[in-house]
Structures are given as C-alpha cells and as structure tokens.
Amino acid sequence: NGKYLCMQKGKTKFEYTSYKWEFPGGKIEPGETPQQALARELLEEMEYPVEVGEKLVTVNHEYPDFSITMTAYLCTPKAEADGFRRREHADSKWCSPVELKNLDWAAADVGVVESIL
C-alpha cells in the first residue's frame, strides 16, 4: 500500500536509542537466513505473519557502545494477517515515504529511510 511500518522504542539502556523510531526486525539466530530471521521476529514480537520480499539496503552503523549491521527488506502481510500486536515498542505507525522524514529515527535506521526516499 506504499506505507512502511515504523516502531518507536521505549526507554532503552542507551539514551541515544531511547524513544527513537526504527523499522521492526531483530537478530539472526544460528542456521537462519536474514529473511527467515525477519519473518520469525515479526511473528514472535508482533504476531504479524509476513512474506519477506526484495532487499532494500544494508546499513552498518557504529553507536558509542555497540555496532550494528542491518539489512532491510520490503515485506507484505500474509493473507491471514489481521494486524499486529505491539509488545516491545512504545508506539507504532504506518508512514508514507514523505511522513518518514518527520520521525526521530535511531541513527542506524536513517540509512534505510534514505534508501526509501
């Protein structure tokens, strides 16, 4: 539908990531592909079944206390998806590309936003 699911973190142990916006996802477990990990994370954390589609971009970012390599993919909800549950985030919203510019993004996610714009 041309919109992107954006999730707002709650308070984290690092001030620079607290209450920032991010795209949903998570860590890859041993034996998983990045696509399998993304589908699993969305199902576990949000009860949201998705089909993982094309790769958008891979971003490497160095925070003061850790580094992250993040690969973003376009996803579409599976037919049985009836919305999602927000379990680990303070807020969520669906945003058009123009609306993405208005959010206070986690630094690592800025590269993903730029690839969309």
Regions flagged by a language model, labelled:
Residues 1-21:
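N-terminal strand-loop-strand
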Residues 8, 56-59:
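Short hydrophobic alpha-helix segments
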Residues 8, 24, 74:
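Residue-level detector of conserved, well-ordered beta-strand and adjacent loop positions
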Residues 21-27:
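Short glycine-enriched, charge-decorated loop/helix-capping segments at active-site entrances
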Residues 27-51, 59-113:
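Unchanged
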